[in-house]
């Protein structure tokens, strides 16, 4: 069984499985040439959508996170996307810990290398 997590995806499938990742205690999304904080990505979507984003958007990552989380209670679809990205990033981080430790499902051996296909 090939790893599903990688820090350097080489295919569309690999990029999809590793779209959201953690770095320096924050979550990033692979968008453009470099990774972008998921908070900044979602605030960019807010501006493009014409959301009533505060004129002075918070400058700290913590405040941006709180602002996006508060929008969930208003039914904001971008806040829902932010919540999904956050959840996906946490699940990927946990899976990466298992893979880094060499833990695989019973009856399987974990192989390093190109990501294999997965049957769901």
Language-model features: where?
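Long, leucine- and charge-enriched amphipathic alpha-helices
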Residues: 85-109
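Extreme N-terminal leader/activation tails
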Residues: 1-82, 102, 109-120
């Amino acid at each position: 069984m090939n790893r599903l997590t990688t820090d350097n995806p080489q295919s569309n499938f690999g990029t999809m499985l590793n779209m959201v990742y953690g770095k320096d205690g924050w979550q990033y999304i692979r968008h453009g040439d470099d990774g972008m904080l998921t908070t900044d990505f979602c605030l960019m979507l807010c501006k493009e959508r014409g959301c009533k984003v505060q004129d002075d958007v918070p400058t700290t990552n913590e405040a941006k996170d709180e602002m996006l989380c508060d929008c969930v209670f208003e039914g904001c679809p971008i806040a829902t996307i932010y919540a999904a990205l956050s959840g996906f990033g946490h699940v990927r981080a946990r899976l990466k810990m298992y893979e880094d430790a060499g833990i695989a499902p019973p009856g399987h051996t974990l192989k390093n290398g190109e990501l294999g296909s997965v049957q769901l």
